[in-house]
């Protein structure tokens, strides 16, 4: 799908509809964003992108958020910008023409900046926000910890792998976000363990940071909470 999101700018997204969907999950990948199109299919190794079928099996419509035509690689500053919010709003408007299901924003790593910041911007027009491997440590351009989280007014799940050793997504900082989510009607910090055989640098998708070899379990935990948000 390709949507006109700003003057002379289009933003693509990958749409996976599900009959009788309990919700629509809009997935924001980490790194510089995007879907990793190759041969007409999403090929990114990002945790959320590679787990898209698991979300579909859980009974959700799935939308993979692409990058806008004027910003092929996202950065933390853009993820907090009015331009990014305009892109997200336009994509959600298009999604609503396809399904009336309530919308959840789900981000991982750098994508948690997008999910949280856009969630603040969108207010009650969305159902909730899920943050995985949350970018809560210090980095140039800002992190989730720097956002006005007291203005995030929908249910929020912070889902974190206990063995995530990426220096900008440590579990202890993710846990501290709970104290800042004062407007969220329901909030939950869920720290999990599992998986095996991590490879590559600790901030990459096939390490514990990306829930390696526990993708199905992680998606099941997230999906259950989306369907029944409890503290």
Name the predicted role of every residue range.
Residues 18-54:
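Short, surface-exposed "cap/lid" segments of acyl-processing enzymes
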Residues 38-42, 51-52, 73-82, 160-163, ...:
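Second-shell loop/turn segments in exported
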Residues 52-72:
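Conserved alpha/beta-hydrolase
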Residues 93-151:
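Primarily recognizes the serine-hydrolase "nucleophile elbow" in alpha/beta-hydrolase
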Residues 128-194:
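The feature captures the conserved acid-bearing segment of alpha/beta-hydrolase catalytic domains
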Residues 184-231:
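C-terminal catalytic histidine-bearing segment of alpha/beta-hydrolase fold enzymes
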